[in-house]
Amino acid sequence: MSNTDSKTGPNTDPATCELDPAIAERVRFNADGLVPAIVQDITNGDVLMMAWMNDHALAHTLATKKGTYWSRSRQSYWIKGETSGHTQRVEEVRLDCDGDTVLLKIEQTGAACHTGNRTCFDADRLA
């Protein structure tokens, strides 16, 4: 299935996006079909959050340049900022050396964390 709709541009439904086979063979999804995605602010290098992606979420992110993730608790897709307005414009997507983690370098508008903090790593320092 194509990642583009002739009327609206990139598909708005992540479930309909298909990952390029050349990319899919390089990503090592876990047994649940997920890969961790580390989200980093492209302007200052701060790590903002970690979320999970399946192949459709990754395909949707690549096609739309919007941070798209898989919620394990809700068993559904979520596009960052769709309800909060705290959007992520994806500038780069990289795969780590083992192929089992994705790095998204993004431009964040508003808070990245669902708590309202700029980053999910603002609190609870362990050392």
From Swiss-Prot:
SUPFAM superfamilies membership: HisI-like
GO cellular component terms given for this protein: cytoplasm
Source organism superkingdom: Bacteria
Residues spanning the signal sequence: none
Textual note on the cofactor: Binds 1 Mg(2+) ion per subunit.
Enzyme class: hydrolase
Keywords of the record: Amino-acid biosynthesis, Cytoplasm, Histidine biosynthesis, Hydrolase, Magnesium, Metal-binding, Zinc
InterPro entries for the chain: PRA-CH (IPR026660), PRib_AMP_CycHydrolase_dom (IPR002496), PRib_AMP_CycHydrolase_sf (IPR038019)
Record-listed Mg(2+) binding positions: D96, D98, D100
Catalyzed chemical reaction(s): 1-(5-phospho-beta-D-ribosyl)-5'-AMP + H2O = 1-(5-phospho-beta-D-ribosyl)-5-[(5-phospho-beta-D-ribosylamino)methylideneamino]imidazole-4-carboxamide
Entry's Gene Ontology BP terms: L-histidine biosynthetic process
EC number annotated for this UniProt entry: 3.5.4.19
Family per similarity comment: Belongs to the PRA-CH family.
Subunit structure: Homodimer.
Function: Catalyzes the hydrolysis of the adenine ring of phosphoribosyl-AMP.
Stated name of the protein: Phosphoribosyl-AMP cyclohydrolase
Annotated organism of origin: Corynebacterium jeikeium (strain K411)
